[in-house]
Amino acid sequence: MKQLYDETLTYKRRLDLAIVLYTHQLHPSIQPVMKYVDVVSLWIWTGADIQKIEDNFKKYRSLVPDKQTLLGIYMWDFGGKKELNQDFMVKQLDFAYRLYKEGQIEGMIFHCTPLVNKNLQAVEYAKEWIAKHGDEKR
């Protein structure tokens, strides 16, 4: 990672070095790598872990206090291999919205899947949420 980071420093127009991180990977062992990262895309793999979203974000910030962060928003529970409960989607988006408005994250990434036309509750809620808040500024 250091070699890649150092290489980006030689570019005429330096590109940010971004990494995908899942909440189940939040461990002190990630810290040495994080010093070479500019942007973190933070994701929750298992829908049930959305219940711990606030604690996991605090843990993330204790390990990675100063990196630009995009919060990943899944519309399907990939870890649980099932439809994401709409209540979980509401909780996930409410928390992400608050973090964004407070300046704790730079934005959100909605994982676009082949499920977006399947009339799933979480997907429909996400569509409504994006229509309502998508153009908002801090």
Regions found by a protein language model. Name each.
Residues 1, 65, 85-89:
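General structural signal for secondary-structure boundaries
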Residues 1-28, 39-42, 66-79, 108-113:
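Aromatic-lined carbohydrate-recognition surfaces of secreted/lumenal glycan-active proteins
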Residues 3-11, 32, 36, 59-63, ...:
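Alpha-helical structural signal in soluble globular domains
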Residues 22-32, 50-62, 91-95:
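Alpha-helical scaffolding within the catalytic cores
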Residues 35-37, 52, 121:
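Alpha-helical protein-protein interaction elements
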Residues 43-48:
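Short, acidic/turn-prone active-site loops that include or flank metal/cofactor-
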Residues 49, 70-138:
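Substrate-binding cleft of secreted/luminal carbohydrate-active enzymes
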